[in-house]
Regions:
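Catalytic strand-loop segment that frames the active site of acyl-thioester-processing enzymes
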Residues: 1, 88-148
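Hydrophobic, proline/glycine-rich low-complexity stretches
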Residues: 1-4, 12, 155
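Short structured motifs
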Residues: 6-14, 25-26, 38, 163-170, ...
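HotDog/MaoC-like acyl-thioester-processing domains
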Residues: 13, 17-22, 28-99, 173-175, ...
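Structured core of small recognition/catalytic domains
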Residues: 121-200, 207
Length: 243
């Protein structure tokens, strides 16, 4: 048995993935040092022949020499893939310059949850799916607060799309823990938005995870991003860090 824990992950979304698309995930070991494994991976759309997403994941695990060799060999196999683009060195930099772990006391409360039995992973802790589910709910509440609510989206056929994200996991969330998501914008561009969520233990105030996301509002008919509406920009500016 190998004990492991995901420490952080960066993702860049490159192309849309359509219903019934055939996908392949290709992994490559970037480094194995000091009980940390850094993996690069790509999600490849076989039918569209393009890369839909790029990931860089840091995992903490205890490896002896034999297991380290097995892991390295496993993730460097390339002869069975349908993807020809196996050169991972050409990715644009996965930078991680963002606000610190400490969350703003003036942040928008975007989600409140509790860890239930159906949220647990094999270690009986709140799973990554539970945490990312909090992120999805928080984004919906944040956009609703700024004016991009359900009715407005339906009337104008507007959606939203994440461009990339950076997540860091700090602590586990055991059964029964009540958590709150605190959210601030970190950048408001002409079309793009960047915001950060901090998932916090209601009892201790400890940060369980944080995630910064770059996203756009998306015209579903034209299939392209749109300029941030002025009303949205005004409300979002009130939540801008250091505003």
């Amino acid at each position: 048995k190998i004990n492991y824990k995901i420490l952080n992950e960066r993702c860049i979304f490159s192309r849309e993935v359509h219903l019934n698309s055939v996908l392949e995930i290709i992994f490559k070991v970037k480094s194995i040092n000091n009980d940390e494994l850094v993996l690069l991976s790509k999600v490849y759309s076989v039918d569209h022949e393009n890369v839909a997403a790029y990931f860089e994941t840091t995992i903490s695990l205890s490896l002896d020499e034999q297991i380290e060799k097995i892991v390295f060999n496993l993730f460097t196999l390339g002869d069975t893939t349908l993807l020809n683009e196996l050169d991972f060195s050409d990715l644009r930099p996965l930078t991680d310059n963002r606000p610190p772990k400490i969350y703003s006391r003036d942040a928008f409360i975007s989600c409140k949850k509790a860890v239930n039995t159906w949220d647990l992973n094999h270690d009986l802790m709140g799973s990554s799916r539970f945490k990312i589910g909090c992120v999805s709910d928080a984004a919906t509440h944040l956009f609703t607060y700024c004016g991009a609510d359900f009715n407005w989206r339906n009337e104008y056929d507007i959606g939203s799309a994440a461009l990339d994200y950076s997540v860091r996991y700090y602590k586990d969330a055991p059964l029964g823990m009540a958590v709150t998501m605190y959210t601030n914008f970190t950048k408001i561009g002409n079309k793009s938005l960047k915001f950060i969520h901090h998932l916090v233990d209601d009892n201790t105030g400890d940060v369980i995870m944080d995630i910064e996301i770059a996203a756009v509002l998306f015209d579903l008919q034209k299939r392209k991003s749109m300029v941030v509406p002025e009303e949205f920009r005004v409300k979002a500016s009130k939540l801008l860090i250091n505003n």
